[in-house]
Amino acid sequence: AALFVSIHADALPKREGDAQGATIYTLSDKASDAEAEKLAEAENKADAIAGIDLTEEPAEVADILIDLTQRETRTFSNRFARTLANEMKNVARMHKHPLKSAGFKVLKAHDVPSVLIELGYVSNKADLQQLVSESWRSRTVASVAQAVDAFLGKRVVLATP
């Protein structure tokens, strides 16, 4: 896969406040804030990169290969997250800090740029109104598609010799 996008809507118990707006998460070993940390699951170390089994490699070699691949993938993930936030801000109410990072399991692929989009909070009245609006969902999907097209187009240009 050239890109992985996981789309969610969240809820927050009343006692934890009134979160609102869309947020885009990328993978990080350390959460960008307490809210991101609460949403993320514990990290598991993967054994393969791009389908290559590293279990037979010396641990040092496997760790170096995983680290190099993760660095490049995180750079691409962060670049896509910025592109996505730029597209989404025209149609979606964004969180006051729309770009965050945390150790979500769904973002663990070492070799595929990945983001998790929280479109909003069903526990917030204004967000819920947007989430149930077919028109809003269509516009939001279109903005995500534009971001994907823009990102993949740039990657093709960068990869062309």
Where are these regions (language model features)?
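Active-site-proximal helix/loop segments of hydrolytic enzymes
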Residues: A1-P161
